[in-house]
Curated annotation (Swiss-Prot):
InterPro entries: Ribosomal_uS8 (IPR000630), Ribosomal_uS8_CS (IPR047863), Ribosomal_uS8_sf (IPR035987)
Organism encoding this protein: Legionella pneumophila (strain Corby)
Presence of the UniProt keyword Acetylation in the record: no
GO terms, biological process: translation
Family named by the database record: Belongs to the universal ribosomal protein uS8 family.
Taxonomic superkingdom: Bacteria
Biological role: One of the primary rRNA binding proteins, it binds directly to 16S rRNA central domain where it helps coordinate assembly of the platform of the 30S subunit.
GO CC entries: ribonucleoprotein complex; ribosome
Descriptive protein name: Small ribosomal subunit protein uS8
Gene3D superfamilies membership: 3.30.1370.30, 3.30.1490.10
Assembly behavior: Part of the 30S ribosomal subunit. Contacts proteins S5 and S12.
This protein's encoding gene: rpsH
Pfam families: Ribosomal_S8
Amino acid sequence: MHDPIADMLTRIRNGQQAKHQQVTLVSSKLKEEIARVLKEEGYIQDFFTETLPNGLKSITLKLKYYHGRPVIEFIKRISRPGLRVYKSYKDLHSIPGFGVAILSTSKGIMTHVSAKVKGVGGEVICEVA
């Protein structure tokens, strides 16, 4: 696997299309922070991490539905290993459909709205709506 974040986003997308209640994947600090932002913004119900018997940490995301439809209409990787995308806080614009962009900034992982308020730019990890 060359891009673990793209894998995470694909698992969320596929899990919701298949109407799964939760998806589980190998954990990392970045994935946990992305999950935290998704929970704060109301795109997932909850998430938790656990250590497996083999010593690896896993993260389980509880997916969220509204009237039987997935809350996440689209989730798209923006910055990827072959093409990094960085934006200044001045260049951060709204996402169609009340969506958010998730950024990695010098002050941590946050939405584009928080980054604008704090006056920081960073790498645009993904867009969610």
